[in-house]
């Protein structure tokens, strides 16, 4: 298990981190010259929870933001676990036959990845799996877009996605891939039990080897004239169909 300090920037991301995971927020930086009342609320909330707050210059915030629009606030987030590929088996085992995994095969846009992670956190997924290559990693933009979910979810970057899917199948995880050209509907699938939902990248969808390692390929029915959805929208639709099935009485 590796740990390191990381910066989260933007009002929503910082608010979410303070409210949901204050024990890992080490300090909050607030732009001294700002008149934004929301920053005052953040400062008061952070102090109530025992988090150090410092008023700093815009230039200081620019430095920790790495070019991402910080909206006058940043938080230093410490002791975030960096999940490793070998952790995946333990996570699935710990889910007790109810693992829900989101697999993103080559998502390149950090805003899309962040939005997917936010939906995944809301759906209560066990872990998110991404390839180490041909995919955006966890960066400041992803953290901001995810409203802090990127640092609370197990996000596992794997060297060989096809191999990881094979290992999941050995743990009795059903692998369902989303593809627009097939006949099987998402709503015909049984998404209870151990399930991995696999979505492709923005440009090319699922890669060939990824498709070949899916147990079933399905599509999201779209009666309108648009033939595809943004990957983050598709992830939300798919995840919450699984949630619906799992929570039916």
UniProtKB/Swiss-Prot annotation:
Binding site for S-adenosyl-L-methionine: 200, 220, 229
Keywords: Cytoplasm, Methyltransferase, rRNA processing, S-adenosyl-L-methionine, Transferase
UniProt cross-references to Pfam families, sorted A to Z: SpoU_methylase, SpoU_sub_bind
Assigned GO CC terms: cytosol
Gene3D superfamilies hit by this protein: 3.30.1330.30, 3.40.1280.10
Catalysed reaction equations from the record: guanosine(2251) in 23S rRNA + S-adenosyl-L-methionine = 2'-O-methylguanosine(2251) in 23S rRNA + S-adenosyl-L-homocysteine + H(+)
Annotated InterPro entries: 23S_rRNA_MeTrfase_RlmB, Alpha/beta_knot_MTases, Ribosomal_eL30-like_sf, rRNA_MeTrfase_TrmH, SpoU_MeTrfase, SpoU_subst-bd, tRNA_m1G_MTases_N
Annotated compartments: Cytoplasm
One MF term in the entry's GO annotations: rRNA (guanosine-2'-O-)-methyltransferase activity
EC numbers, comma separated: 2.1.1.185
Enzyme class: transferase
Keyword Protease: no
Record-stated family: Belongs to the class IV-like SAM-binding methyltransferase superfamily. RNA methyltransferase TrmH family. RlmB subfamily.
NCBIfam families in alphabetical order: rRNA_methyl_3
Chain's role: Specifically methylates the ribose of guanosine 2251 in 23S rRNA.
Protein name: 23S rRNA (guanosine-2'-O-)-methyltransferase RlmB
Record gene name: rlmB
């Amino acid at each position: 298990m590796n740990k390191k300090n990381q910066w989260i920037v933007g009002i929503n991301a910082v608010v979410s981190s303070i409210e949901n995971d204050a024990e890992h927020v080490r300090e909050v930086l607030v732009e001294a010259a700002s008149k934004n009342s929301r920053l005052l609320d953040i400062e008061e909330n952070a102090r109530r929870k025992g988090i150090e707050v410092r008023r700093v210059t815009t230039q200081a915030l620019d430095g920790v933001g790495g070019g991402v629009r910080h909206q006058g606030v940043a938080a230093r987030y410490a002791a975030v676990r960096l999940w490793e590929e070998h952790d995946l088996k333990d996570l699935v085992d710990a889910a007790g036959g109810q693992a829900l995994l989101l697999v993103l095969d080559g998502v390149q846009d950090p805003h899309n990845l962040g939005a997917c992670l936010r939906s995944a956190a809301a759906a209560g997924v066990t872990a998110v799996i991404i390839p180490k290559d041909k995919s955006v990693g966890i960066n400041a933009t992803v953290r901001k877009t995810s409203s802090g979910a990127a640092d609370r979810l197990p996000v596992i970057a794997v060297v060989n996605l096809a191999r990881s899917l094979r290992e999941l199948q050995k743990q009795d995880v059903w692998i369902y891939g989303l593809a627009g050209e097939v006949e099987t509907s998402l709503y015909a699938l049984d998404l209870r039990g151990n399930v991995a939902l696999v979505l492709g990248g923005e440009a090319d969808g699922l890669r060939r080897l990824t498709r070949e390692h899916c147990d079933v390929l399905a599509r999201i029915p779209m009666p309108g004239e648009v033939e595809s959805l943004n990957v983050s929208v598709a992830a939300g639709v798919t995840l919450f169909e699984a949630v619906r099935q799992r929570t039916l009485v």
